[in-house]
Structures are given as structure tokens and as C-alpha cells.
From Swiss-Prot:
InterPro entries: AceGlu_kinase-like_sf, Asp/Glu/Uridylate_kinase, G5K_ProB, Glu/AcGlu_kinase, Glu_5kinase, Glu_5kinase/COase_Synthase, Glutamate_5-kinase_CS, PUA. Pathway: Amino-acid biosynthesis; L-proline biosynthesis; L-glutamate 5-semialdehyde from L-glutamate: step 1/2. It is an enzyme of class 2 (transferase). This is Glutamate 5-kinase. PROSITE patterns: GLUTAMATE_5_KINASE, PUA. Belongs to the glutamate 5-kinase family. NCBIfam families: proB. The gene is proB. It catalyses: L-glutamate + ATP = L-glutamyl 5-phosphate + ADP. One of its GO terms (molecular function) is ATP binding.
Amino acid sequence: MAVGLQKLVHYKRIVIKIGSALLVDPQTGLRAEWLKSLISDVANLHQKGVEILLVSSGAIALGRTLLRLPKGALKLEESQACAALGQIELAKTYSDTLAQYGLKTGQILLTLFDTEERRRYLNARATINVLLRFGAVPVINENDTVATSEIRYGDNDRLAARVATMMGADLLILLSDIDGLYTKSPHRDPTAEFIPFIASITSDIEKMADVAHSELSRGGMKTKLDAGKIANSAGTAMIITSGKRMNPLAAIDRGERGSFFAAGEKPVNAWKTWISGHLDPSGILMIDQGAVKALESGKSLLAAGVVAIEGRFNRGDTVAIVDTNGVEIARGLVSYGKDESVRIMGRKSEEIESILGYEARSAMVHRNDMVLRCLTDSA
């Protein structure tokens, strides 16, 4: 068993991400027997009181297989048409397979806007909570039929992490075609070393990410590490393990290889959980070392500590706060739009009113609207 990982039955709520390459064979379509073995594991955990949420890729891959489309990249509208065709087949298969074990399922299709906009986020969370209360197994996917490049997650690793943080899951399982994190790509370099335990995702860990993509999957190791950072920021543990074997959840409990990412400290409230999980900040505030120390001690970010600003944002948008080396220190909701922020950056709080012409907040990002990232630099 991966270092730090408990038996799955000891977790109260688990999100499981299933990759396209595991679920869909490009020649034959759905891997029905493999899926049945996974659902058998899910049913076993469900019977023991563990709440399971499935984040399933595969709609586009299944659709293009059903249409017998040739290899190669698809146009956006072609991908969306494949998703429309594949999603209905995928939902039916999940429903039929879960029903064999006496379980019901509910389909949830999300776009990025559904988790980044607060009201929609709360509504999605409430709906999924009711499904769980009814004893159903939610099956969640990105709504590929309508999502454009501007409002898409881009991969289901990040979607799964966002769902895990939104739902307060104890554990996120990424079932992949690789059994964990390596120092290098094991497919290309035989000297690659396996890493069983990751205390925090540092810059050195991120350098190990394999950015390779396949036609059936939009993800790679980089997106899995992105998912790990999202999960970590909300106090959710994560494991990356191979899903190629039958009964992949039982395999985890048997001790098959996987990389375990320790959970970070949970945010103090639901508001900060929502902020911490934002995937695409609208802008970046670069701050000096004095401001870094102030944030670490629990203070708000003042304009005086800001040395550079990037992006386009309005008041209330999410921004990333980075040090002068570009390392993200925190994420929060900014008190000013881009133009006003540029005018007051580097200035003392008592100067802001005279610069802007009205009485304004002294904090560019208030501590109540901010979540610190993990600042350690050792794995």
C-alpha cells in the first residue's frame, strides 16, 4: 500500500477519476468488463458506508470510436458532437452497470463557470449532496458539448480535484495509465525512479511532470500535479495509481504501487475552500519579501507590498499572489480592478484615498478573502 494511505474503507468520501484511455478502447469501444470490475469495488465500499463520486472521462473518445473517425486532432465542434454521442452511451452504461449491484446513479455535467461562480458552485454542491443522501453514486464529467476553450477545465484531473474540494472529500484517486510519479518519464528513461510519497508539491516535484498527451486523453502528469495542488489546498489527500488492472480499487488495498500525496491543512471555512480551488485566476500580483512575510503571519496584502501586476481583472475576481521568483504564495479575491490596482501598487495605505479620489479599503487582498498555498520547499 502507498505510504501514508489507509485502507479505503476508512475514508468517508472518495472521488475517483477515470481516464479515457482506461475506459475506451479506440478499436472496440467501451471496456465493459473492466468497468464492471471497478463498479464491483465501488459497490463493496458503498455497502460499507463510503460515499463514492465518479469523475469519468470518455465521452469524446467513445463518440469518435462509435463514429469510426480516423486518428488525428478534432475540431472543437467535432469534439462536441462526439461528446454528445458518447455521453449518452456512457451514462447508460454506468446506470446499467451500477444497477447490477443495486445502486442508482445521477449524471452531473459541469463547465468551469459552474465551479468558479459562487452561486452556481453552491447549487452544484447542494445537488450532489442530495444525490449522496439518496444513496446514489454521482457520475460527473465536463459538459464537453457546450464548453468552449474559455470556460473549460481542459482535463478531468483538475475537474476531479475541484469536485473533491467542493464536496469535502477525504481522498481523491486518479486512476491512470501510469502507476504514479517518477523522477523522469519511465517510458523514455529506464533510470526513472518511482516516488511513493509526496508531502507537498514543490518546484522540484513539478519539474518531474511528464507533459506527454495522447489522442484519447487531454491529461498528463502535469495536470495530475495541478490536481494535487488543488486537493492539497483544501485538505484532501490524493493517490495516483494504475487503473489498467481489473478491480483497481481492491488493488490499492492489496498494496499495489501508487504515489500518495499528503493532504494539506483544511481551509478554516467553506468560503476559503471555494477560493482555494479556483482554477484560473484572472490576474497575478507580484509582491516583495516583506509582503510575503506579512502574508505568512496571517496579515492582509497591502498595496505597498505589490511590485508588479499582470492580467485583466475586476474587483472581486480571483488573483494569484506570487513572490519575485514567480512562486505562488496565495490566492485571493482582489479589492480593486486592474487599472486602480496599477495606480496604487507600491503606495502606502494612507495615500490611496488621494490617488483614487474616494475612501477605499487599505488591503488590496484582505486576509479573509485569501488562502495561502503550501510554502515549504521539500517533498
